[in-house]
Design a protein with these regions (language model features):
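A glycine-rich helix->loop->beta "capping" turn
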Residues: 104, 121-150
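The beta1-alpha1 cofactor-binding region of Rossmann-like NAD(H)/NADP(H)-dependent oxidoreductases
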Residues: 111-122, 196
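Short, flexible helix-coil linker/hinge segments at the edges of structured domains or between repeats
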Residues: 148-194
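Glycine-rich phosphate-binding loop and adjoining beta1-alpha1-beta2 segment
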Residues: 75-104
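Class I SAM-dependent methyltransferase Rossmann-like catalytic core
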Residues: 3-32
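Canonical Rossmann dinucleotide-binding motif of NAD(H)/NADP(H)-dependent dehydrogenases/reductases
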Residues: 43-71
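Rossmann-fold cofactor-recognition segment
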Residues: 99-115
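Conserved small/polar residues in nucleotide/adenosyl-binding loops
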Residues: 197-204
Length: 204
């Protein structure tokens, strides 16, 4: 497959496995040279939202600086015949490769972290890894969540509250500076965005 960049506004929405590997490798190299005192290091870490951003960086730090066992939970799209996978998918593959090279214990679950099925799988993996986690990183950025107790689906949005947002943006495709306007969120959108990250059951 030949991967070509696809630009939306000023964001490249096409990921490349080699680029993701290099990104994760650079972070791991930095973490390897930042060894923390043994007493300050977690031994077993659960990362909810482990494929990009703060979650991925926290996992890399725990694994390569502290030699911690890590379990990552993420929901990423794999590759298709003529379409590459998401960046998060390649990031996880890169992390697994580097973890194996350094003899680290690293497990992953690709699934909906809000679902009962995924929670049960985390519990089983935790048992296999030796028990409770002494550090939990919560770094989920999901656009929607279905509450397993009643089937209600909540959808998040990124909009201003109580005012119209206006600013300039760069369209790299057309090489133009444009004005962008975003209308304020409705009461329903605000409610859904807040409820998306509210625990749906006492077990959470």
């Amino acid at each position: 497959m030949i991967i070509k960049p696809r630009i939306k506004g000023f964001v490249c929405i096409t990921s490349h496995p080699s680029g993701c590997l290099e990104n994760v490798r650079q972070q791991a190299e930095l973490a390897l040279h930042t060894n923390l005192p043994e007493g300050n290091c977690p031994k077993r870490v659960l990362v909810l939202g482990a494929s990009t951003g703060y979650g991925l960086a926290s996992r890399i730090s725990a694994a390569f600086s502290c030699k911690a066992q890590t379990l990552g939970v993420s929901f990423e799209r794999g590759p298709k015949e003529e379409k590459p996978a998401s960046a998060g998918y390649y990031n996880i593959a890169a992390f697994q490769k580097l973890a194996r090279e350094h003899g680290l214990v690293a497990e992953d679950i690709n699934g909906d972290a809000f679902s009962d099925e995924c929670k049960n799988e985390v519990i089983e993996k935790a048992k296999q890894m030796g028990g409770e986690f002494d550090l939990v990183i919560y770094s989920l950025a999901s656009p929607r969540r279905t509450d397993p107790t009643d089937g209600q689906t909540y959808r998040a949005c990124l909009k201003p509250v109580g005012m119209i947002y206006k600013n300039k943006t760069l369209d790299t495709d057309r090489k133009e500076v444009k004005e962008v306007t975003i209308n304020p969120a409705t009461e329903e959108e605000i409610s859904h965005t807040c409820l998306l990250y509210t625990s749906p059951s006492p077990r959470d």
